[in-house]
UniProtKB/Swiss-Prot annotation:
One of its GO terms (cellular component) is plasma membrane. Pfam families: ATP-synt_ab, ATP-synt_ab_C, ATP-synt_ab_N. The record marks 383 as: Required for activity. It is a peripheral membrane protein. The keyword Ion transport applies. InterPro entries: ATP_synth_asu-like_sf (IPR023366), ATP_synth_asu_C (IPR000793), ATP_synth_asu_C_sf (IPR038376), ATP_synth_F1_a_nt-bd_dom (IPR033732), ATP_synth_F1_asu (IPR005294), ATPase_a/bsu_AS (IPR020003), ATPase_F1/V1/A1_a/bsu_N (IPR004100), ATPase_F1/V1/A1_a/bsu_N_sf (IPR036121). This is ATP synthase subunit alpha. GO terms for molecular function: ADP binding; ATP binding; proton-transporting ATP synthase activity, rotational mechanism. It comes from the Bacteria.
């Protein structure tokens, strides 16, 4: 090898010298270990931390912070990681060391959580001691595929006449409850949970961004009505960080999936997803993701679709495969009742339209109806159930066919009747019937009705037994009829509650019951 230096002299290097030089270099080389799952906080602001050095972190990974807290990795950038702190962040400082755990966020699941109030991470906040859950589950799970699903054909009774007759809900369905503030959305969901206390359906109530006093009231009501024992309450109140409010629905869903995947039935209420979307928008803007319509990030549709797709009815093969053959021949279901709050009845805003398009129907609650004393304030005109019809109890399905038609005709005629004074007999009769059906659909809170009670009341309305009852006496008539039936026809009531069947014999018995009651004139 020939090297020319300064052009005036040259030196020769032989192969031995070269190999010695290389050996020398190798011996003097220092190995500096680079911790790929350890990083340093470079900035802290508004619950968002930027971390330098976490090379091997995954999307959604738990990052351990000083003091036993965690952050969630959401932005994986070229030279830094953006993570959102779950919990208080005031004492975090630049330069602090953090560690990647290699785990996605998991929450405890199982029957041990029933009857308890927990936070987003599954930690008890009801002061009743620790929860000895044996299993945990990731909060983000891919929803069951098409092959694993089964069609919806079993009912979830809400206990509301208006819902069970016109907008029936099936096990594994997603039914949106939508309306302005103070229209009875939470009341409807809580009543649906109370009605499941003897149905074998487990319930999960997820409170997102609500006042702590409101949540305490809900828990007390569930306890008073004996429904807390088979309910899990997941709380991310208004005072919690945006990260916990964003994650709460997924945590609640993971707890519900435990029952679904083992051949049980569960009902989950998200109260409400508008607040979750706002929390997610806050996180996204702080992470400097580009805003879109109404300043929401581009993936706000996916935020809700991946959550609501996990509510499903799964078939026997899926359950058997999931439980390794322990549970055979049983289907499982998770029914979702997401709640969305609208502003001044605007259902065409971004988040409401998204959730309407994801769900299998919606129950629309109207402020005008609520203020007029029609409670629950269900608007039968724009409320639908896209898959619940095949899940409806046979007797309710047979009897309630005319209810929606009667109310639709009544609404049309009522608008017309305002401008016309001389109405013919048929129109007057239709208006009168519509008014009485509207009156009959009213129901008090915390008073869910059994299948028999609903069937009997609808039977009386449909067969003209209310025609000679004054409008202001309709609810008295209903109460007296039910009390009479429970006393005199207890066997029939038990049979209908159990089977939900409808045939000529049952029809004859209902007719005899109502005729006997009308003869007493005791309302």
């Amino acid at each position: 090898m020939h090297c020319s230096l300064n052009g005036d002299w040259s030196m020769q290097l032989n192969s031995t010298e070269i190999s010695d030089l290389i050996k020398q270099r190798i011996e003097s080389f220092e190995v500096v270990s680079e911790a790929r799952n350890e990083g340093t906080i470079v900035s802290v602001s508004d619950g968002i931390i930027r971390i330098h050095g976490l090379a091997d972190v995954m999307q959604g990974e738990m990052i351990e912070l000083p003091g036993g807290r965690y952050a969630l990795a959401l932005n994986l950038e070229r030279d830094s990681v953006g993570a959102v702190v779950m919990g208080p962040y005031a004492d975090l400082k630049e330069g602090m060391k953090v560690t990647g755990t290699g785990r996605i966020l998991e929450v405890p699941v199982g029957p041990e959580l029933l009857g308890r109030v927990v936070n987003t991470l599954g930690e008890p906040i009801d002061g009743k001691g620790p929860i000895e859950a044996k299993l945990t589950s990731p909060v983000e799970v891919i929803a069951p595929g098409v092959i694993d699903r089964k069609s919806v054909d079993q009912p979830v009774q809400t206990g509301y006449k208006s819902v069970d007759s016109m907008i029936p809900i099936g096990r594994g369905q997603r039914e949106l409850v939508i309306g302005d503030r103070q229209t009875g959305k939470t009341a409807m969901a809580i009543d649906a949970i109370i009605n499941q206390k003897n149905s074998g359906i487990f319930s999960i109530y997820v409170a997102i961004g609500q006042k702590a006093s409101t949540i305490a009231n809900v828990v007390r009501k569930l306890e008073e009505h004996g429904a807390l024992a088979n309910t899990i309450v997941v709380v991310a109140s208004a005072s919690e960080s945006a990260a916990l409010q964003y994650l709460a629905p997924y945590a609640g869903c993971a707890m519900g999936e435990y029952f679904r995947d083992r051949g049980e039935d569960a009902l989950i209420v998200y109260d409400d997803l508008s607040k979750q979307a706002v929390a997610y928008r806050q996180i996204s803007l702080l992470l400097k993701r580009p805003p879109g319509r109404e300043a929401f990030p581009g993936d706000v549709f996916y935020l809700h679709s991946r959550l609501l797709e996990r509510a499903a009815r799964v078939n026997e093969e899926y359950v058997e495969r999931f439980t390794n053959g322990e549970v055979k021949g049983k289907t499982g279901s998770l029914t979702a009742l997401p709640i969305i709050e609208t502003q001044a009845g605007d259902v065409s805003a971004f988040v409401p339209t998204n959730v309407i398009s994801i769900t299998d129907g919606q129950i629309f609650l109207q402020t005008e109806l609520f203020n007029a004393g029609v409670r629950p304030a269900v608007d039968p005109g724009i409320s639908v159930s896209r898959v619940g019809g095949s899940a409806q109890t046979k007797i309710i399905k047979k009897l309630s066919g005319g209810i929606r038609t009667a109310l639709a005709a009544y609404r049309e005629l009522a608008a017309f009747a305002q401008f016309s004074s001389d109405l013919d007999e048929a129109t007057k009769k239709q208006l009168d019937h519509g008014q009485k059906v509207t009156e009959l659909m009213k129901q008090k809170q915390y008073a869910p009705m059994s299948v028999f009670d609903q069937a009997l009341v609808i039977f009386a309305a449909e067969r003209g037994y209310l025609d000679d009852v004054e409008l202001n006496k309709v609810l008295d008539f209903e109460a007296a009829l039910l009390s009479y039936a429970r006393g005199q026809y207890a066997e029939l009531a038990a049979e209908i509650d159990k089977s939900g069947a409808y045939n000529d014999e049952i029809e004859a018995q209902l007719k005899k019951l109502t005729d006997d009651f009308k003869a007493t004139q005791t309302w």
